[in-house]
Structures are given as C-alpha cells and as structure tokens.
Amino acid sequence: MCGIVGYIGTNNAKSILLEGLEKLEYRGYDSAGIALQNKDLVTVVKEKGRIADLASLVPSDAFGTTGIGHTRWATHGKPNHENAHPHQSKSGRFTMVHNGVIENYTLLKEEYLKNHSFVSDTDTEVIVQLIELFAAELSTKEAFKKALSLLHGSYAICLIDQTDTETLYAAKNKSPLLIGKGENFNVIASDAMAVLKETDEFVEIMDKEIVIVTKDGFTLETLEGEEISRASYTAELDASDIEKGTYPHYMLKEIDEQPAVTRKIIQAYQNEAGEINVDQTILDEILSSDRIHIVACGTSYHAGLVGKNLIEKMAKIPVEVHVSSEFGYNLPLMSKKPLFIFITQSGETADSRQCLVKVKELGYRTLTLTNVPGSTLDREADHSMYLYAGPEIAVASTKAYTAQISVLAVLAVSLGREIGDAEALSINLAAELGIVATAMEAMVSSKEVIEHIAGEYLATSRNAFFLGRNIDYFVAMEAALKLKEISYIQAEGFASGELKHGTIALIEDGTPVLALITQESINWNIRGNVNEVLARGAKTCVFAMENVAQPGDRFVIPQVHPLLTPLASVIPCQLLAYYAALHRDCDVDKPRNLAKSVTVE
C-alpha cells in the first residue's frame, strides 16, 4: 500500500521518479505525485489517478537533481488532488511524502498546530507542519527527529528542505524503506523493485532510524543520535524479472509461471541425494513444540488451511490457523511450547508483523514463510523458509499461493520423515511435485476452455458460489477470493455440507455454482449437493480430478497425489477469475481499492 521513491544525485530526477513509481503500481494506489528540487526551487506535481495521468501533467522541462515521488492509497481523506502526496509545509520550505498511519495526528494538531490552516485531510500534512514549526529553532535534522519522536503509528518518510539542496532526509517505523547505493547518486525506496534500473545494492533502514542522504553517501542514526553502520546487500532480482514481456497482464504471466516455480522449489529444497530436505534446526524446533499456530491474511490464510491439513497428517502435531488481523484481539489459550508460522508473500504485511512482535514478546519461537528474503518478517522471525516464486506483481496472488502450499508440503513431509510417519516415508515428494508441475502445464495450455466457461457463467453474473468438501473447501475459498478481487463479483466459497444450513436460501434461477471435486471419499457427497442446487435453478459447473470425473463435468483436472490436489485444482479457478475479469472489462492487475502489499493495519 503506497510507495515511495527518492533520488539525490547529478541527473534529472524526473524520469527516475516516474519510472520508479510505475514499478510500484502493483502495491495499489489511487493518486500519485512527485516533487523536483532545482537549487532553491521545488516543483510539486500531483493528481488523483494513474502514473500515466501524472506523467502527462509534469512539464517537459521540469528539472531537479533531488526529488521525491509517491503513490497514495487513501487512509485519511478522500483520493483527490489535495490529499495526494507530496505535501508541503505552510511556507513551502519542506516537502514530504509518507507511507503509514499516524494514530495520534489529531492530538498533535490540537496541541501544536491549533492556529494552522491545512490544505488536506491527511495525517501526513500534520508531520510536515510540525517539522517546519520545530525548524524555527532547530536544525532540519533535529526538527525532523523531534517531530518523529511525537508520532504514534507507522511511517516511512522522505523529506526535502528547500534551503538545503544537498540533502535528502528519510525515516521509518513499521513501514518498509531502504537506501539504494549508486555512484554520484543515492536513492530511497519502499521496495527495491522501484529502483532496480538504477542500482542493485541496498541498505535496510530499521525502525525508528533516520537517514541523511547526499549524492556521495548517507548517514544512518537512531532518533537518539547514535550513528549506525550497516552492511549493504545485493538484490537477487533483475529488472527484467518485473516486466510483462509478451503477456497482456502480469496475472496471466504469473499463472503460467507456476510450473516453473514448482520445479524451482523442488531444486531449492533437494539435497545431494535428490531427497526433499529442510534445515535440521527448523525441524528440531518444530518437533520440540506441542502445538503450531499458523498466522496469515487473505490468500496466505487459505494456504495455511491446506498447511494445517498436511502438517497434522504427517507430523502429528495439532495446528491452529489464525487470521492475522483478528489474532491480537483474543490470543488463543497457549500450550506449554507453541510455535508460530507466519505466511506472507511480501514479508511486510502489517497485521502479520504485529502478531509476530506480540508472540516474540511472549517468548515464543517463530518461523516465516515468505517470498522476499530480507523483508521485515524474514528478519524478525527466528527462522525462515523461502518461496522462490520470483516477483509477483499482479495484486491477485497466484504463484505465491501455490508456492506457499508447495513449501508447506516440503515442511510437512520432512517433519513426518523425522518422526517415522509411514505416509511421509512412502511419498517421493520431489517426484510428486514434478507431476504437479506437469499437470499445471497441461491446464495452462487449456485456457480457451476456461475462457469459454467464464463467459458462459460469469460474464454478467452478480454473484457466484464455490463448493468443496475437505481439502477442496479450502480451494473453494481461494477461488471465491480470486473472483471477487478482480471481477468484482460477490463470490463465496462454502463447505458444501453447509448448504442446507442457510446458504441454499440464496440460490435462484441462474445462480452460478461451481463445485471442486478431487477426492474419491467425498465425490458422491458433493455431487448430491450439486444436484440440490441444480433442482433450485442454479447454473452448475463441476471441475473434477481425473479419478472422480464424470460425463458432464466441465473441466477435468489432471491426476496428482491426493495430498497435493490444491496445487492442481486452483489453476482452473485462477484462470476462471482472470477471464471473468476480462469479460467484465475489469483492471486485472490493479483491481479497485486493493493493494498488493498491505503495510498498514
């Protein structure tokens, strides 16, 4: 949610900022803006809408060797010109962009800025006005630090001082921000992908630190003034990794990448003997626990439900799955030695991060499954396992979901082998995941079938239901989330046995009902539920695995191991959502009101 790019150097910052903001579009935004500093002149251009709209408003001769840019996802105030960033202080001396939420901004307004008039409804403008207030008696750095010391909440900030053309200021707390190192320039960004074209060498900024940046270097300090030395790291991404190539949308590209990602996970977790292997320290830590708590949001939560099924079957350890945003309100009764697994694509999800902080304070051990090495949850957890999915740009997660389940399967089977579980010992997981990858390839090669189904069932529908039992129920929930995210159809995933307990009242003539069937044990049960809704006028569609497919089923899913069926059955559901969105002329990669990385609570 929201994105920041800052530049200080010898070149014109304009194109660097605009291109950087384009790379951050996937994070979600409703307005954007840049500020360019040329000597003591600061030019601010901002507007509601897309980066392309902003770029058309920037004068062709706009110039500045220092600049800051921002994409805003509204939290305080409507998405409009006034609330778009950058924001300026009353005199125009200070110009600032900010990600995050300041919880006490109204109190600060009342205490320090009673007589100030404000242009916007944002919490951000309060910060920049405070800095100017304190700068009447303090240096810019000290005024910045004093303002920061008063803030309660999350922030990533980049600041320009009109009277100092040689310096850029930045700070962070609970919101991602990093420094990119260059020759005769330096950059600030909320995500390395924004500035990969400029540099691949980065330094993390930690919570409650500020950085004073010039074109020649930077100084990191705590708010108390202690200087910090921190080594840089080289990003493992390449600028080409975040391009669409020949694809019309990132989402379609990422759906097609899932077979390759699955094979990459096999390679990443295979030992020299060709066996799937997890770090022994992680296995020992988990097996010494008496209960596992999986904490996640959205798609990651759905992957966690599958993970619970796998781990309990293989490792014989009870598992609970929690929604991150609800977890902190009512902590579960803790066993003697619980372990917490956090699943997060970005490694920056604010709700999950707050949960991690809470359980660490209680002294419990933690493991993060993330796609981003070096991310906040990766750094702060005791252990990490990586997804190896590569950058996922589309807001609707596809390859990260299947990567999460694949890595959870790797973990579950490895744990099962450690305790001598017969099923874990009998499964050749590398081979079975290879079969999954082949099945995925077959399905992504059958796009025209799914496209036709999407047009027939969903092009004009206002709602849709997905049914499943057992492990298929978890995929039904994910299928519904994908559809509602990008097509704006009110979709829900249900345990089909619950239909008669309320949901069937919503069925009327033409209601689309899609059933997932991959398990022999529940085949006829769910087909009975399909017949029940069919009798009440529903328009039914069955996606079934080869071993349970019947004449009349609309799509046959290639056979995979029974424990790994979600990896296969989700593929046609992802494609269904994609083509439904196209039929409805929706923005597939950037659906309204959504953000890829949810960095505020």
From Swiss-Prot:
Disulfide bonds: none annotated. GO terms for molecular function: carbohydrate derivative binding; glutamine-fructose-6-phosphate transaminase (isomerizing) activity. InterPro entries: GATase_2_dom, GFAT, GFAT_N, GlmS/AgaS_SIS, GlmS/FrlB_SIS, Ntn_hydrolases_N, SIS_dom, SIS_dom_sf. Residues 2-216 form the Glutamine amidotransferase type-2 domain. Pfam families: GATase_6, SIS. It catalyses: D-fructose 6-phosphate + L-glutamine = D-glucosamine 6-phosphate + L-glutamate. GO terms for cellular component: cytosol. Residues 282-421, 453-591 form the SIS domain. Its EC number is 2.6.1.16. The gene is glmS. The lineage of its organism: Bacteria, Bacillati, Bacillota, Bacilli, Bacillales. It is found in: Cytoplasm. It comes from Listeria monocytogenes serotype 4b (strain F2365). HAMAP family: GlmS. One of its GO terms (biological process) is carbohydrate metabolic process. This is Glutamine--fructose-6-phosphate aminotransferase [isomerizing]. Gene3D superfamilies: Glucose-6-phosphate isomerase like protein, domain 1, Glutamine Phosphoribosylpyrophosphate, subunit 1, domain 1. The active site is at C2 (nucleophile), K596 (for fru-6p isomerization activity).
